Design a protein with these regions (language model features):
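Conserved MFS/SLC helix-loop-helix module at the cytosolic interface between two early adjacent transmembrane helices
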Residues: 57-96
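Extracytoplasmic
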Residues: 10-41, 62, 228-233
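Extracellular/periplasmic helix-loop-helix junction of adjacent transmembrane segments
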Residues: 32-58
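Helix-loop-helix hairpin linking two adjacent transmembrane segments in secondary transporters
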Residues: 97, 134-179
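Juxtamembrane intracellular "pre-TM" segments in multi-pass secondary transporters
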Residues: 2-4, 185-215
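MFS-fold secondary transporters
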Residues: 85-90, 101, 105, 178
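Cytoplasmic helix-loop-helix junction between adjacent transmembrane helices
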Residues: 101-142
Length: 235
């Protein structure tokens, strides 16, 4: 199978696209939320909440799995889940159905930004990793701007379903890209302990006051962001 250099520009571009996956999934359909609410007779804001719940829970799973079996397989599985979830969203005929598929979609979308950071950690030292993360952050900043603009143009000609079909197409392109990137977490560096042992470490972190202080600060920041995103389509 064709592979690419793990430190070339193409590899960086793929990681940037994976990092932007979450921002695109949450922001691209914001202009369509009022139409979705009317069409499905429900609160479209719940689909954003459902996505965030799925995204948060999925991190606990994919992180432990990727330390055990490597980065590439979870990436492939996650992107496939994202594609299937996006198809489900596009075909949804009720708000509850759409909500369920959004949670499912989030389980796949989570792998992009999470494992991109892990792959950078695998390949780079502290200084280089900081530079790479800065580069990827630029793309993450562009996605929330470009997504709603693109969706707004789509809604001129099509219904809200087209936005999720666009995410399907993006997911397929991401899957092709993921298939050619190299594995960055070699066998000798993978965790030899059980996944259950990793979950025990989560409890250790939750009992660490320093960790929880930083976590609450970051959480408060994102609460404000998503509160704004939820209400912005109706302003």
């Amino acid at each position: 199978m064709l592979t690419i250099s793990n430190k070339g520009w193409l590899f960086t571009s793929i990681l940037s696209a994976l990092m932007a996956c979450t921002s695109l999934s949450t922001d691209i359909y914001l202009p369509a939320m009022p139409e979705m609410g009317r069409d499905l007779n429900g609160d479209a804001e719940l689909t954003l909440t459902g996505f965030l719940i799925g995204f948060a829970l999925a991190q606990l799973f994919w992180g432990a799995v990727s330390d055990k079996i490597g980065r590439k397989k979870p990436l492939i599985m996650g992107v496939v889940l994202f594609i299937v979830g996006s198809v489900g969203c596009a075909l949804s005929s009720s708000m509850m159905e759409l909500l369920a598929w959004r949670v499912f979609q989030a389980f796949g979308a989570c792998v992009g930004p999470m494992l991109s950071r892990a792959m950078i950690r695998d390949l780079y030292g502290r200084t280089e990793a900081a530079k790479m993360l800065s580069t990827l952050a630029i793309v993450m900043a562009i996605a929330p701007i470009a997504g709603p603009m693109l969706a707004g143009h789509l809604l001129v000609w099509y219904t809200w379903h087209a936005i999720f079909w666009l995410l399907v197409a993006i997911g397929i392109l991401m899957l092709i890209a993921v298939l050619v990137i190299p594995e960055t977490h070699p066998l000798e560096k993978r965790s030899k302990k059980s996944i259950g042992h990793t979950y025990n470490n989560y409890w250790i972190l939750l009992r660490n006051k320093g960790f929880m202080k930083y976590t609450l600060c970051v959480s408060s920041f994102y609460i404000a962001i998503y509160a704004f995103l939820t209400g912005s389509p109706y302003v």
